[in-house]
């Protein structure tokens, strides 16, 4: 084993934070230094050249400290016996660089601790602060890392002796293995194996427990019900299915696949030909698939991997729909207990305690959103929608006074995708079809996730809880998705017959489900499964929940094609069995020469005992809302700090919102980029205005008083949100229903039934809405002991509705951004029929009250009329702005609209004279619309036509300035500066950013929000945006070839190819594996573009591993050197491609002074819509654009320029090789965050070579080359955005 020192692992501010935590734990630690250490397992000695190559390969990140570290060593490494995602990717890079002697690379962090005298207990506390026990271990000597490369022998299976010991043996196994089997299931298994005449193996029992867990089988939703001694006619699931029976319109697949599918639009889908790699548009139906999952249990235990794998699993569900589909855009949601931010605690936040094994709500929200965002970012899926709610209180609900809150959190992950018409239905599995696992190797992780998540937190063993959390490797999932994409793009020749994702229960659930759904059985070989931990037992190999895996059936004759696709994409796969005629499962283990599984499928998936729920209805007593102590001004301030209301920038800018080049409406609205969008909208393709919309609705606190009203309100809110998109037909909207409940808690079961009935049997059929997909999580309770007393925290019944719809024209989406350009009017459309209830509202929550009467859907007919009226007004282009009434009520609706428009409001609420407080803070359904004053009569007549005449109230108008004033008649009710409200609203996000990210950056961003004179994003163009300078060359019908270059993990190549294609190029898909294998050479191309993403998951530095695989491979290095030297070529590097090409500067003439691109100053992935200025440089891509100031999409974690010395910066500047700089909204070059999202010196974000043929930039022009994909743009822009000029300039240069 070779040991090689690496770069510093923690920045100064991270060390300061760590020292501060040590102080809180009363540890006498004086200083900490941390650096990466690399361990190389080699099977032959390295030559001097190869040693130098390895040293160079592992030189990345900030410069290595010159001094020898001082202090006591604590070395944190991956758990021995595991192989980390970092290891597998770094090893891949080493092999691609020709270092075949390297068996494996691994990395640890060496912490050098300088401290006073510490006890063993204190060292253990410090150790626990430095590592994650699920994934890591701590050594005290570098040499101990040798254990990382130890090889363990496989552990044999166990048999449970029920034939001799009887039922008690099964009961003991149930506890020891954490199976969570019910008594009748134990009876079922006893009977089944006695009939088979043998003892079950531990593998069979574990597989049965996972496949039949509540998590996988949804027993409660399929149960029979007796409520108040009355047998109920339908199960919960049948009531949900009733929505489809009543309104099957536009639904193509429901209830029987990994995601539901509805009818989409006929558009041109853009992808590369399998024959020659040439990209083009393919006219076809792009149907819409939808899915929303939860990952609550793992997120409570370990938030980052819990949320990350939650998103990853949902993405796999989409990709594994039908015979293969394409995930497109995502959403996330979180419900947690109170944050209690240190030093920023709020008046309504009381500490009720929690069990040790789960993390705090604050830690969940510090880590969980980062995990979810990181997976989406690295996979390449924009995260465009979400919700965030906190609740934790002692309230008088259905079961009397008790603690209600989210110690067991909700972590929601969902999204949309597209699928071809011929692939919606899965194929048949033929006898003899090859059964394949696509994706990464097995590891001893995620065991028992299905069973563990089916229990209330606190019921299972703590070690089992930790074992049930998975690890993430999104770059691996991206590779698998590329394989799936290549397959579905083959149309009728798609080799995938059947596909499922591997989720809860691992292969033990996925493979039986695959063969059973295909009408077959299966014969498998355990040792064919890719395995990174050979010491695992058969149970662990078969049942672990290692992520990023799919199971597929492929016909034998199609196998060579499938294997070739996998090899090109470097996606691991294993053929582990074949389908059999007999519906039987046989798993052979050639190592031990036995059969861990040998059972009929009917025993595993047959008619296990059906659940019966015999429950009683309880009425919530509630209490009248005591308002004597509520001061209006104080109420506003409190509500602005409630997380459900407050600004959520800290949850949004961590997530890429522009990848795919098909995002039309993200969360950020207007020139000031305020996160208040009502819904998310994508284009159906890269050349269309058809699209898809998503919105969310949830009203969980209402359920503490009225279960059914809470469910109806969730549907209603999702509708009032999605109404801002142009959908036309209400029946086009399809819903996902995610139900979270503490089943078995007094009153909750009957309440769940009432809520499902209200939605499935009544409201949705009345509206013509269908719920073709959903999920349930029935164990939303946490138990623990505190000083000998048992305590419980029970979540409210929580229904999260996600609405999905086809969009007729994405350009018609209306946002909350107010306009003051003309005389205007603000109208409130009140669907609450003047009830103005306050039970379960934000106002009640911030005063620690509950109330007794809640908002509700007062009339399904009026709600439908509202949607139809808004659609008509959008079609007539009569709405200037739109925002629904939601958390915080009317006052928050108006405030958020004012924030988006950076303007004042003057509103008269005399309609609420009877109860002004209720009028301002009720959360009854409704919306505020801004219209031209001259259109008021017409708009009111349209609303009246749809039965809303009595619901419409004129409020006032938006006006320039900072005054936010509310009157009741002539009496001033409330006055505050809009800028002050904006800062209150932003303080939660500021405090969270300060804790989580670089506090200096958080402070700068908060300070920027205090600038009331900020003009917002603005545009200055020095060229004619409407001129197509490539048109004359396109008319020649000669398309020069551009190599659209990608490495494993790159995710922005399709939108890049589309931009070049539009400019008149023939875009060719070129994978690095094509160059390394010699399938393709660069000599045939005049233009090369290196695309964005996460090559090798950014291990060994962003883009550096990709670059070194070129620099250290002689044949490929020569190809690039020759290409860059040719005077007739152009080269562009964007984002990850920019980072990669900056490390190839020794090959690029005139690029010797280029910088490297390193970690952002915020130390966070930054997704922003940033303003840049095009500077005077030789860049051929930016010709005739000099002096322009244009917003552009930014999405990166490592974009800060780092020069080797000051002279290199000076040479770059003096030679005018800086091509783009970040500027603030005043047009000044800036290093301030967030106008400069990475902290680059002199605002540098693009550089070019001396002759201008090679340009690299961190922002993404390809994602915003169409106007419709800009988060904000001037009204006069038409089809093309200004960044399209880059690609047309390239075409012009080639003549």
Swiss-Prot record:
- What EC identifiers does the entry list? 6.3.5.3
What are its GO cellular component terms?
cytoplasm
Task: Outline the extent of the Glutamine amidotransferase type-1 domain.
Answer: 1042-1295
GO terms assigned for molecular function: ATP binding; metal ion binding; phosphoribosylformylglycinamidine synthase activity
Under catalytic activity, the entry for this protein gives: N(2)-formyl-N(1)-(5-phospho-beta-D-ribosyl)glycinamide + L-glutamine + ATP + H2O = 2-formamido-N(1)-(5-O-phospho-beta-D-ribosyl)acetamidine + L-glutamate + ADP + phosphate + H(+)
| UniProt KW keywords | ATP-binding, Cytoplasm, Glutamine amidotransferase, Ligase, Magnesium, Metal-binding, Nucleotide-binding, Purine biosynthesis
State where ATP binds: 306-317, 677, 886
Instruction: Tell me the domain of life.
Output: Bacteria
The keyword Aminoacyl-tRNA synthetase belongs to this UniProt entry's keyword annotation = no
**Active site per the UniProt annotation:** 1135, 1260, 1262
Where are the residues of the annotated region Disordered?
302-327
Q: Which GO terms describe its biological process?
A: 'de novo' IMP biosynthetic process
What does the entry list as the binding residues for Mg(2+)?
678, 717, 721, 884
Where it sits in the cell: the answer is: Cytoplasm
Asked if the keyword Membrane belongs to this entry, the reply reads no
User: In what pathway does it function?
Assistant: Purine metabolism; IMP biosynthesis via de novo pathway; 5-amino-1-(5-phospho-D-ribosyl)imidazole from N(2)-formyl-N(1)-(5-phospho-D-ribosyl)glycinamide: step 1/2
Fetch the InterPro entries from UniProt: Class_I_gatase-like, FGAR-AT_N, FGAR-AT_PurM_N-like, PurL_large, PurL_linker, PurM-like_C_dom, PurM-like_C_sf, PurM-like_N_sf
Summarize the protein's role.
Phosphoribosylformylglycinamidine synthase involved in the purines biosynthetic pathway. Catalyzes the ATP-dependent conversion of formylglycinamide ribonucleotide (FGAR) and glutamine to yield formylglycinamidine ribonucleotide (FGAM) and glutamate.
**PANTHER family assigned to the protein according to its UniProt record, in alphabetical order:** PHOSPHORIBOSYLFORMYLGLYCINAMIDINE SYNTHASE
User: Which family does the UniProt entry place this protein in?
Assistant: In the N-terminal section; belongs to the FGAMS family.
Quote the subunit structure annotation.
Monomer.
Q: What is this protein called?
A: Phosphoribosylformylglycinamidine synthase
Q: Which organism is it from?
A: Photorhabdus laumondii subsp. laumondii (strain DSM 15139 / CIP 105565 / TT01) (Photorhabdus luminescens subsp. laumondii)
- In the UniProt record, the gene name given for this protein reads purL
């Amino acid at each position: 084993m070779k040991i090689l020192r690496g770069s510093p692992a923690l920045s100064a501010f991270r060390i300061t934070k760590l020292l501060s935590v040590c102080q809180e734990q009363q540890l006498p630690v004086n200083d900490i230094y941390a650096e990466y250490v690399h361990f190389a397992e080699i099977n032959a000695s390295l030559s001097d050249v190869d040693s130098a190559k390895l040293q160079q390969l592992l030189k990345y990140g900030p410069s290595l400290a010159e001094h020898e570290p001082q202090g006591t060593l604590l070395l944190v490494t991956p758990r021995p016996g595991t192989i980390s995602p970092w290891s597998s990717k770094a090893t891949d890079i080493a092999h691609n660089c020709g270092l075949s002697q390297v068996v494996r690379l691994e990395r640890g962090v060496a912490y050098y601790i300088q401290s006073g005298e510490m006890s063993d207990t204190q060292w253990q506390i410090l150790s626990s602060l430095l590592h994650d026990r699920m994934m890591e271990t701590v050594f005290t000597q570098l040499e101990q890392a040798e254990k990382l490369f130890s090889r363990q022998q496989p552990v044999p299976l166990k048999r449970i002796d029920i034939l001799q010991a009887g039922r008690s043996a099964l009961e003991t196994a149930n506890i020891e293995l954490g199976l969570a089997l019910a008594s009748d299931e134990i009876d079922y298994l006893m009977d089944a194996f006695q009939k088979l005449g043998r003892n079950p193996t531990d593998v069979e029992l574990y597989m049965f427990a996972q496949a039949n867990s509540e998590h996988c089988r949804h027993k409660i939703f399929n149960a029979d019900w007796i409520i108040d001694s009355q047998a109920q006619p339908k199960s919960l699931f049948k009531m949900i299915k009733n929505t489809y029976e009543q309104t099957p319109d536009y639904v193509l697949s429901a209830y029987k696949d990994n995601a539901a599918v509805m009818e989409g639009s006929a558009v041109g889908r853009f992808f590369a030909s399998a024959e020659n790699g040439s990209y083009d548009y393919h006219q076809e139906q792009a149907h819409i698939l939808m899915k929303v999952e939860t990952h609550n249990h793992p997120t409570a235990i370990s938030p980052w991997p819990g949320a990350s794998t939650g998103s990853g699993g949902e993405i796999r569900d989409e990709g594994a729909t039908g015979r293969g589909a394409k995930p497109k855009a995502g959403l996330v949601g979180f419900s947690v207990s109170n944050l209690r931010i240190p030093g920023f605690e709020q008046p309504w936040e009381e500490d009720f305690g929690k069990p040790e094994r789960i993390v705090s709500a604050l830690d969940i929200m510090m880590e969980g959103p980062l995990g979810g965002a990181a997976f989406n970012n690295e996979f390449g899926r924009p995260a465009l929608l979400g919700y965030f709610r906190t609740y934790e209180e002692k309230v008088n609900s259905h079961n009397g006074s008790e603690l209600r809150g989210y110690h067991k959190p909700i972590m929601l992950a969902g999204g949309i995708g597209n699928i071809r018409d011929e692939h919606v239905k899965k194929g048949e599995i033929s006898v003899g079809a090859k059964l394949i696992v696509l994706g990464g190797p097995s590891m001893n992780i995620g065991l028992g996730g299905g069973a563990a998540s089916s229990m209330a937190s606190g019921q299972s063993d703590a070690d089992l809880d930790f074992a049930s959390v998975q690890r993430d490797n999104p770059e691996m999932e991206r590779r698998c998705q590329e394989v799936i994409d290549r397959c579905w793009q083959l149309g009728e020749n798609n080799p995938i017959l059947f596909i499922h994702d591997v989720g809860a229960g691992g292969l033990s659930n996925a493979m039986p489900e695959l063969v059973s759904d295909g009408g077959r059985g299966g014969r498998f070989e355990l040792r064919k499964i890719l395995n990174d931990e050979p010491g695992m037992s058969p149970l662990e190999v078969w049942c672990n929940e290692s992520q990023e895996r799919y199971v597929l059936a492929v016909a034998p004759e199609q196998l060579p094609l499938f294997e070739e696709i996998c090899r090109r994409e470097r996606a691991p796969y294993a053929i582990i069995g074949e389908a059999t005629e007999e519906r039987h499962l046989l798993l052979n283990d050639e190592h031990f020469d036995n059969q861990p599984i040998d059972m009929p499928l009917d025993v595993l998936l047959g008619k296990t005992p059906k659940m019966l729920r015999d429950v009683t209805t309880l009425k919530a007593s509630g209490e009248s809302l005591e308002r004597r102590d509520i001061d209006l001004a104080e109420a506003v301030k409190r509500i602005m700090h409630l997380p459900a209301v407050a600004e959520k920038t800290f949850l949004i800018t961590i997530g890429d919102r522009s990848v795919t080049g098909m995002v039309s409406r993200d969360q950020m609205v207007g020139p000031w980029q305020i996160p208040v969008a009502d819904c998310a909208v994508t284009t159906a393709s890269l050349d269309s205005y058809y699209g898809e919309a998503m919105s969310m609705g949830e009203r969980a606190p209402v359920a503490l008083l009225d279960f059914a009203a809470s469910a109806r309100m969730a549907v209603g809110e999702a509708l009032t949100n999605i109404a801002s998109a142009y959908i036309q037909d209400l029946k086009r909207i399809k819903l996902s229903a995610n139900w979270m409940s503490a089943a078995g808690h007094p009153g909750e079961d009957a309440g769940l039934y009432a809520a499902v009935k209200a939605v499935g049997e009544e409201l949705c059929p009345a509206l013509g809405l269908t719920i073709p997909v959903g999920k349930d999580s029935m164990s939303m309770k946490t138990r623990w002991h505190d000083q000998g007393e048992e305590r419980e925290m029970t979540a409210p019944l929580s229904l999260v509705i996600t609405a999905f719809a086809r969009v007729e024209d994405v350009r018609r989406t209306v946002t909350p951004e107010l306009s003051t350009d003309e005389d205007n009017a603000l109208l409130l459309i009140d669907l609450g029929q003047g009830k103005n209830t306050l039970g379960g509202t934000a106002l009640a929550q911030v005063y620690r009250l509950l109330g007794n009467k809640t908002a509700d859907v007062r009339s399904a007919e009026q709600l439908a009329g509202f949607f139809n009226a808004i659609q008509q007004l959008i079609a007539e282009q009569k709405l200037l702005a739109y925002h629904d009434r939601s958390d915080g009520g009317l006052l928050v609706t108006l405030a958020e609209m004012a924030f988006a428009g950076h303007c004042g409001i003057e509103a008269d609420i005399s309609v609420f004279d009877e109860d002004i407080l209720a009028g301002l803070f009720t959360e009854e359904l409704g919306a505020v619309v801004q219209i031209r004053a001259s259109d008021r009569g017409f708009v009111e007549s349209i609303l009246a036509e749809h039965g809303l005449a009595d619901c419409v109230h004129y409020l006032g108008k938006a006006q320039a300035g900072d005054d936010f004033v509310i009157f009741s008649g002539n009496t001033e009710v409330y006055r505050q500066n809009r800028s002050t409200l904006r800062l209150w609203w932003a303080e939660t996000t500021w405090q969270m950013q300060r804790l989580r990210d670089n506090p200096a950056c958080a402070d700068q961003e908060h300070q920027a929000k205090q600038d009331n004179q900020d003009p917002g994003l603005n545009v200055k163009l020095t060229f004619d945006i409407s001129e197509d300078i490539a048109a004359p060359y396109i008319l020649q019908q000669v398309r020069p070839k551009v190599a659209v270059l990608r490495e494993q993990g790159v995710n922005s190549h399709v939108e890049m190819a589309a931009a070049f294609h539009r400019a008149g190029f023939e875009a060719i898909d070129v994978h690095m594996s094509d160059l390394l294998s010699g399938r393709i050479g660069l000599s045939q191309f005049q233009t090369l573009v290196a695309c964005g993403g996460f090559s090798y998951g950014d291990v060994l530095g962003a883009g550096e591993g990709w670059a070194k695989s070129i620099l250290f491979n002689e044949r490929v290095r020569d190809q690039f050197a020759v290409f860059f030297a040719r005077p007739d070529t152009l080269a562009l590097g964007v984002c990850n491609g920019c980072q990669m090409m900056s490390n190839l500067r020794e090959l690029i003439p005139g690029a010797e002074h280029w910088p490297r691109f390193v970690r952002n100053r915020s130390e966070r992935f930054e997704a922003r819509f940033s303003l840049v200025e095009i500077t005077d440089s030789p860049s051929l891509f930016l010709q005739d654009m000099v002096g322009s100031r244009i917003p552009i999409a930014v999405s990166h974690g490592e974009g800060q320029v780092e020069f080797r010395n000051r002279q290199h910066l000076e040479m770059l500047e003096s030679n005018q090789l800086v091509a783009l700089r970040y500027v603030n909204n005043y047009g000044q070059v800036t290093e301030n965050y967030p106008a400069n999202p990475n902290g680059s010196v002199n605002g540098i974000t693009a550089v070019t070579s001396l002759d201008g043929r090679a340009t690299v930039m961190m922002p993404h022009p390809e994602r915003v080359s169409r106007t419709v994909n800009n988060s904000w743009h001037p009204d006069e822009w038409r089809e093309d955005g200004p960044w399209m000029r880059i690609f047309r300039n390239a075409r012009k240069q080639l003549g």
